[in-house]
Amino acid sequence: MNRIAADVQRAFENAGEKTLPIKVEEIVLGKQAADSLLDYVKRKNNQHIVLVCDANTHRIAGIDLENRLNQEGFQAECLIIPENEAGDVTADERSLIHVLIHTKQPTDVMIAVGSGTIHDIVRFAAFQRDLPFISYPTAPSVDGFTSAGAPIILYGTKTTIQTKAPSALFADLDLLKAAPQSMVAAGFGDMLGKITSLADWEISRHLAGEPYSPAGAKIVQEALAACIEHTEDIAMKTETGIRVLMESLLVSGLVMLALDHSRPASGGEHHISHWIEMELMEKKRPQILHGAKVGCAAVLLTDTYRKLAQDDGLNEFSPSRREAIQSAYQTLPRGEVLADWLRSAGGPAYFDEIGVGQDSVKNAFRHAHTLRDRCTGLRIINENKTLINHGLYE
């Protein structure tokens, strides 16, 4: 097992917590990662290889990787997913069917060449075809590379399906450093979203009896802290900054994989992001980077949750429930602190900066909690009229 995965597994074991085994055989984060990928497929004797890309990732990484594989005697072919009417590649029925239909027989392994959306499509397709897949990220933009969950759009609704994790991941630092600043900032935003997701997870433990892992929370908290500590390096896209960001994203994904759920990394801020994504698709508007939406939602929710912890409407709750809510939310950083971090990394901090209007944000705030059967501060506010009447929508 590789170091990053071994460290995560060991942290759970040292805490005496039982988890699913982490079966990502190899994780390489460094220079010339493609060399390690070639060595890996040779050892696995994977002869027929399908690389799944979009037009952009095909240009920046897919062509070169396909050529290198074919020069080594493999039968490799790039499968480029076409854009939709809004000019996006999305993980929806259209893209999933395209990949399933055009993945030829025989295929020994699939390679996801891209960022979050490409990986969601490939992990679902590989799961359906009972094939292993390899992760080859092109930007440090999301934490889902090493997870098994595939958030996809089915019949217009964002749904997360547990599928499979990659058998191996090869992340080239030079390729990641060359990613657009917006995608680096999105990865940072996805990590800052852990501020609210971890608080929501704590609440779900006490108020709904949902599964909780102290070790998992600690691992994700430490990964988040590392990113905040290296905000300037991440903003400057130094080798250290990109390594810290990418490793933190990978660790978050591995924790989700070990626990077989996304609670430590996905709370109310992700539900708001998903709702807005669905609205953009319905209106056939271009998509916004996942991490950018998550970061903006975290800014909104930290301030809202701090208000919730102080709201006298909580007097309607039992003492134990009230204390749990106050304990989880009253020490969250102010939204303006998160906004400063996000802007330092070159990303947006508020929804109006990414073209999402106030009506859309209010709509997401009122309805996004219905996307997942999960206890979050967002759900508590929306399902308790006492709190609503005290102005927490404003």
UniProtKB/Swiss-Prot annotation:
GO terms for molecular function: 3-dehydroquinate synthase activity; glycerol-1-phosphate dehydrogenase (NAD+) activity; glycerol-1-phosphate dehydrogenase (NADP+) activity; metal ion binding. This is Glycerol-1-phosphate dehydrogenase [NAD(P)+]. It catalyses: sn-glycerol 1-phosphate + NAD(+) = dihydroxyacetone phosphate + NADH + H(+); sn-glycerol 1-phosphate + NADP(+) = dihydroxyacetone phosphate + NADPH + H(+). Its cofactor is Ni(2+). Homodimer. It holds the Pfam family Fe-ADH_2. Keywords: Cytoplasm, Lipid biosynthesis, Lipid metabolism, Metal-binding, NAD, NADP, Nickel, Oxidoreductase, Phospholipid biosynthesis, Phospholipid metabolism. Its EC number is 1.1.1.261. GO terms for biological process: glycerophospholipid metabolic process; phospholipid biosynthetic process. InterPro entries: Dehydroquinate_synthase, G1P_dehydrogenase_bac, G1PDH. Induction: Transcription is repressed by glucose and by the binding of AraR to the operon promoter. L-arabinose acts as an inducer by inhibiting the binding of AraR to the DNA, thus allowing expression of the gene. It comes from the Bacteria. Binds 1 nickel ion per subunit. Is not active with other divalent metal cations such as Zn(2+), Cu(2+), Ca(2+), Mg(2+), Mn(2+) or Fe(2+). CDD domains: G1PDH (cd08175). Optimum pH is 8.2. The lineage of its organism: Bacteria, Bacillati, Bacillota, Bacilli, Bacillales. Belongs to the glycerol-1-phosphate dehydrogenase family. Substrate binds at D143, D190, H274. Ni(2+) binds at D190, H270, H290. GO terms for cellular component: cytoplasm. NAD(+) binds at D54, G116, T117, I118, H119, D120, T138, A139, P140, S141, S147. Catalyzes the NAD(P)H-dependent reduction of dihydroxyacetonephosphate (DHAP or glycerone phosphate) to glycerol 1-phosphate (G1P). The G1P thus generated is probably used for the synthesis of phosphoglycerolipids in Gram-positive bacterial species. Prefers NADH over NADPH as coenzyme. Is also able to catalyze the reverse reaction, i.e. the NAD(+)-dependent oxidation of G1P but not of G3P. Does not possess glycerol dehydrogenase activity. It is found in: Cytoplasm.
